[in-house]
């Protein structure tokens, strides 16, 4: 039986091998040309005051400002999913370095704190709403939602009740995506054609069902760059949670997205 000293020694060796391997992979990826495509970033809440609930999903305003400024300094230009779909059809050109900012759930701070930050930088974003949460407690009101859309914010669906579509039968899932779309359009929110899968979970059957329900695109929780060859119903997305290590963590998540793309991990190519 191994004694504790040998266990520690072997554990140290194993850790060292893992570090060297990861370093070699990162070094190799960085030595190669950056892959084609662009990232889609997944946010939830931007709020100055730390919320009691969903704190892990809140990006404080100061951190978010740093992230936006970093993106602009690196030459990124925000686009909407609509812009991407139009460019895919040859109806418009994309900027040299596009990025899409998305926000799930539709918190009210998207209007009070996020919108001014975006408008000050002439940036776009897409917000995915849970239909039955609109107007409730800490979520956007109908009036705010319509105003944001008039001011250039793209609105999409996050289903009617934010339940994982993979946990229900296809008929129930169909009602979830159909009801959310109809509810917003009935309340004078312009045509809804994009969806964010709750918890990022999907199946081939769900993907096909969205197309049948006249959605044009959907985002997952799988990181990676998006190109015109990416399945529009399985767009790659990089999660940006509450930062523990400030801007350095944000840069790492962007780098990880690049590496995932170069290694071909969970890339949804048509």
Task: Please place each PLM-identified region on the residue numbering.
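Short histidine/acidic/glycine/proline-rich micro-motifs that form metal-
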Residues: 131-135, 164, 198-201
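Acidic (Asp/Glu)-rich catalytic clusters
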Residues: 115-123, 140-157
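Residue-level marker for buried hydrophobic side chains located in beta-strands
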Residues: 101-102, 155
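C-terminal active-site subregion of NodB/CE4 polysaccharide deacetylases
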Residues: 2-10, 18-101, 107-109, 167-270
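Histidine-centered catalytic micro-motifs
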Residues: 42, 154-162
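Short beta-strand and adjacent tight-turn residues that come in two discontinuous sequence segments
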Residues: 128, 158, 218-220
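Cell-envelope/glycan interface and biosynthesis
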Residues: 28-29, 111-112, 124, 129-130, ...
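Charged helix-capping and loop-helix junction motifs
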Residues: 138-145, 172-176
């Amino acid at each position: 039986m191994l004694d504790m000293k040998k266990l520690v020694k072997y554990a140290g060796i194993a850790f060292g091998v893992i570090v060297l391997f990861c370093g070699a992979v990162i070094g190799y990826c960085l030595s190669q040309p950056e892959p084609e495509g662009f990232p889609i970033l997944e946010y939830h809440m931007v709020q100055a005051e730390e919320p009691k609930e969903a704190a892990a999903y809140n990006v404080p305003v100061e951190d978010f400002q740093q992230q936006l400024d970093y993106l602009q300094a690196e030459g990124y230009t925000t686009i909407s999913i609509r812009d991407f779909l139009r460019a895919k059809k040859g109806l418009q050109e994309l900027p040299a370095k596009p990025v899409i900012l998305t926000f799930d759930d539709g918190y009210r701070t998207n209007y009070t704190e996020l919108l001014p930050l975006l408008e000050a930088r002439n940036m776009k974003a897409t917000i995915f709403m849970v239909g039955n949460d609109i107007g409730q407690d800490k979520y956007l009101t109908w009036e705010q939602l319509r105003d944001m859309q008039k001011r250039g914010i793209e609105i999409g669906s996050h289903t009617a009740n934010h339940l994982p579509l993979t946990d229900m039968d296809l008929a129930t899932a169909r009602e979830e995506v159909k009801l959310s779309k109809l509810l917003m359009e009935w309340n004078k929110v312009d045509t809804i054609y994009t969806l964010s899968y709750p918890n990022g979970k999907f199946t081939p059957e769900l993907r096909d069902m969205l197309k049948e329900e006249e959605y044009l695109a959907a985002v997952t929780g799988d990181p990676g760059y998006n190109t015109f060859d990416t399945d529009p119903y399985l767009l790659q997305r990089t999660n940006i949670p509450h930062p523990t290590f400030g801007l350095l963590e944000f840069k790492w998540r962007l780098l990880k997205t690049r590496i995932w793309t170069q290694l071909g991990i969970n890339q949804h190519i048509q």
